[in-house]
Regions:
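Amphipathic, well-packed alpha-helical segments that form the structural scaffold of globular domains
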Residues: 13-16, 189
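Catalytic core of membrane glycerolipid acyltransferases/transacylases, capturing the structured
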Residues: 2-10, 17-18, 30-89, 97
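Non-catalytic C-terminal accessory region of glycerolipid acyltransferases
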Residues: 3-4, 93-198
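Hydrophobic anchor at the start of a short beta-strand
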Residues: 22, 59, 108
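Short gly/ser/thr-rich secondary-structure transition/capping motifs
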Residues: 17-25
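A short beta-turn/loop motif at secondary-structure boundaries
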Residues: 28-31, 150-151
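Conserved beta-strand scaffold positions in the cores of enzyme catalytic domains, especially
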Residues: 24, 61, 82-84, 139, ...
Length: 198
């Protein structure tokens, strides 16, 4: 674990736990070693740090490139191991970077809907299925609640579901990726019930 990451994780936990309360469910579903993708719903800018706090291992995030252009924030998220992705086009460089992260046996955090899905209308992209298929990484679905409308002593909850695998290698067809993506999102939103439907 990067020392700065460990410090930042502790600080975020302290703030979130104090102001809102923080609960984690299903941490036993997260493999502690090996290539891993954690795929989560996304409704708030608080989601990446809160997901990181709930995870029992360090998470490297793919983040939209615009964030890296913000002077202080861009430098901070680079220190935390994040790397940029251009959402306006097929970003081959970021895909190669993501596969490299997974080939090192580390954990990659992705929000399949490609950005904040506040009103529930965004359709999930097939990036998680593609990366999992090419790398052989395990995928753990996750659901975050309580970050959309935070107020003092409201509770933030992150739930981790049972891991799954998409194994087709270079032979994965678009239909396969679409099917796997649909199954992944079904599993992510099925976890909502555990949070109380928030």
């Amino acid at each position: 674990v990067i020392p700065f990451y460990a410090l930042a994780r502790w600080l975020v936990w302290a703030v979130v736990a104090t102001l809102f309360g923080f609960r984690t469910v299903g941490r036993e579903n997260v493999p502690l070693t090996g290539p891993l993708i954690v795929a989560c719903n996304h409704v708030s800018n608080l989601d990446p740090p809160c997901l990181g706090v709930g995870m029992p291992r360090q998470v490297t995030y793919m983040a939209k490139k615009e964030l890296f252009e913000i002077p202080v924030l861009g430098r901070l998220i680079r220190w935390l191991g994040a790397f940029p992705v251009d959402r306006s086009r097929g970003d081959i460089a970021s895909i190669k970077t993501a596969i490299g992260v997974l080939e090192r046996g580390t954990c990659l955090g992705i929000f399949p809907e490609g950005g904040r899905n506040v009103d529930g209308t965004k359709q999930a992209q097939m990036g998680v299925a593609l990366l999992a298929s090419l790398s052989g990484a395990t995928v753990v679905p996750a659901y975050l609640s309580g970050t959309k409308k935070t107020k003092f002593r409201s509770q933030v909850t992150v739930v981790f579901g049972e891991p799954l695998r998409f194994e087709a290698g270079q032979k994965a067809r678009r239909d396969d990726l679409a099917k796997w993506t649909e199954e992944l999102m079904r599993r992510i939103y099925a976890l909502r019930e555990i949070t109380g439907g928030n």
